[in-house]
Curated annotation (Swiss-Prot):
This is Flagellar secretion chaperone FliS. GO terms for biological process: bacterial-type flagellum assembly; bacterial-type flagellum-dependent cell motility. The keyword Kinase does not apply. It holds the Pfam family FliS. Gene3D superfamilies: Flagellar protein FliS.
Amino acid sequence: MYTASGIKAYAQVSVESAVMSASPHQLIEMLFDGANSALVRARLFLEQGDVVAKGEALSKAINIIDNGLKAGLDQEKGGEIATNLSELYDYMIRRLLQANLRNDAQAIEEVEGLLSNIAEAWKQISPKASFQESR
């Protein structure tokens, strides 16, 4: 009934609407969710032997971690925690690059676990507390 391009356009509008109405705290949650989703897809593509799709999914996860989560850290206000997170994100990126080169599902799973732990901790933080000092 609907074309694939129509459905894709609707999904894009839905995502854009969610981003536009999200709080800064929710935007970070969305980045965690997006990175996790890309990692799950990468692992599934690896299991299916779809090397191209695996590479694209890992690239998306790396992009979200590097240009979203890491870039969003406030080194000045975050102090040691921000520095530690930045180093952990760098480690995750290296592991995902290795996973892509070596078709290493364990490396993907390792990053999934690390990211899941950080995301869970983020969800425990009050949205007010996470951005209160930014004002």
